[in-house]
Amino acid sequence: MGHRRWPRVAAAVAGVLVTAAAAAAFLNSAPHVQDRGDRFFVVEKGESLSSIAGRLDDEGYIRSPAFLLAAARLRRTEGSFKAGWYRVPPGSTTLAVHDLLVSGSQSLVKLTIPEGWTISRVAALVEERGIAPAADFEAAARSRALAADLAVPAATLEGFLYPDTYFVPAPFPAETLVSMMVETFFERLEKVEPGWRRLGGGGLLEKVILASIVEREYQLTEEAPLIASVFVNRMRLGIGLESCATIAYIITEIQHLPHPEYITLEDKGIDSPYNTYKWAALPPGPIANPGRVALDAAFHPARTDYLYFVLRDPDAGKHYFSKDLDAHNKAKKLYLKK
């Protein structure tokens, strides 16, 4: 009788093994939602494996977090998942995702954004580096809805795209890159002025607008707070800022013309709310994306009585500062070429 039961036991065991193999194959297979093309998954620094597995499941990269956890235990890779941005190809199995996150293979592109660049210049560089189309980047950076989502008190994200060096995969979603730059802005702002939230949205925007103008005017770090003080003093007295940088912004970013070699009297008469020669107020928005020096100067301007400045040493980037118009006119005659 015992010998007669062996075929049935063997068949039962085989059935269990086949079922287990089928279940494992199913749990390892890619979810159907991955048919949308390459997507990006972020492993945060110090994130636990259970958190990673849970998010992979929530975001539709894997079918079962338990299967990933079991695979990691069997392979002894629980502590080997590396932080970073990962491009997950469509159709990736759970084990393929596991191997990708353990390998740390990200193929990142270095993107360095200089201080004082505008949205359009950044967009062109993003496309040049093969990261995202310029049109997509501009659309995201000028999206009022995205600005609201990121708690930016402005119609666009001009001024809030922090100039820094970023490492991202290529290609990379433009909206995600823009969001990353804005998040970096607020991280850096916290170091510049921890109490910035007390300003409210309008107060913060004014500071960023001022910083963007300072960014386009200063050349020496030590002069940035002095230049900021000139603009603050003029605003307090109700005098127009008379910044050539705002005119250049109108010409290049609004009129889409080449950057002028110099600003003419005709240019200073352009009818635009960004014209600080025509209107005694800040422009309606930032004219560039300021860096740490300009932001610090806008939040902490020097205490001076200066109302004017003129470039006195183009090679060194030094300016001469004056307290009244008479002294300023004398400085212009002395330092500016006729």
Regions found by a protein language model. Give the residues of each.
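N-terminal type II signal-anchor transmembrane helix
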Residues: G2-D38
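Short low-complexity stretches enriched in small and charged residues
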Residues: P7-A11, D38-V43, G79, W117-R121, ...
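Hydrophobic core
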Residues: V18-T19, I52, I213
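Pocket-edge positions in alpha/beta enzyme catalytic cores
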Residues: G15, F41-E44, P89, I287, ...
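Signal peptide-directed extracytoplasmic domains
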Residues: A24-K191
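N-terminal start-of-chain detector that recognizes signal peptides
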Residues: A11-G15, E59-G60, A83-W85, F137-A140, ...
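Bacterial extracytoplasmic/cell-wall-associated proteins, especially those involved in peptidoglycan
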Residues: L125, I131-A132, L146-K338
